Amino acid sequence: MKPHGFDLNRVIFTQSAYYLITGVWPLLHMDSFERITGPKTDKWLVKTVGVLVAAIGGSLMVAARGHTVSREAQLLAAASAAGLSVIDVTYVAKGRIAPVYLLDAISEIALLAATAKLKP
């Protein structure tokens, strides 16, 4: 089933681009990243997460561009979106990260919902 004309390749490609951009951003310009998301104590950890998110994005992009989104790639996309959204909501609620992270949570939940509805 393709809700609203979406197919899994498009959804995964969108997620991959989002992950590449948001993952690389703190690596390229930490100052602007912190202006939007708030100051960070452990910049090395922000960069580590950025590298991992970008790596997931790159892997998903290869799958989407090759029109070969496997169940494994779909699971990686869904699990990543679920995990990141839970972290966002949990730590905003605890006051550890800025409320702007709820925008990321909304994006992640939308990606998760779209990915879960589509079949490879």
Where are these regions (language model features)?
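Short amphipathic, positively biased membrane-proximal segments
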Residues: 1-120
